[in-house]
Amino acid sequence: MTGIDDTPPAWDERTQLTTFLDYARGTARAKCKGVSAEDACKALLPSSPLMTMSGLINHLRWVEYYWFQVVFLGEADEGPWTDEDPDREMRVAVDFPLSQLLDEYAEQSARHRELVAGQALDAKAERAVRDGLHVDLRWILLHLTEETARHNGHLDILRELLDGTTS
């Protein structure tokens, strides 16, 4: 994981975008270190019964799949969600060991690193996201960094509630 303190004074745009996404991904994985399979499935926030550490990791994995493979590449959407259960990736995560979910997230991230390396940042997504808008790869990288960082905050809260870990 790249730390904030080892950021060089000058990076090109691609390096900035990919490094900060990788930092956020690494933070998500680090928050799960040492968490038992049982604890990873605990919903500790009464107002968010689907929010578990396993659910968040599975969500992050499938969010990357959706934005890179479905929106950017235009592949068929084979994600776990349905119209009847749009949050299914959060719900089904408790049926899998956290270690498996982390491995799948790492594999997905590695595939996407390769994809991003071979594309221009201004390459447009095959699918429109709304109102006919085709976002570019740059936007997708920024969005995934924001989404991952936001959920890292949720992982922070869950981890602290589980065992008091705050770093």
Segments predicted by a language model, with ranges:
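Acidic/histidine-rich alpha-helical segments that form the ligand environment
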Residues: R88-A125, R138-L144
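Short, contiguous alpha-helical
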Residues: T2-P8, R14-D87, R127-S167
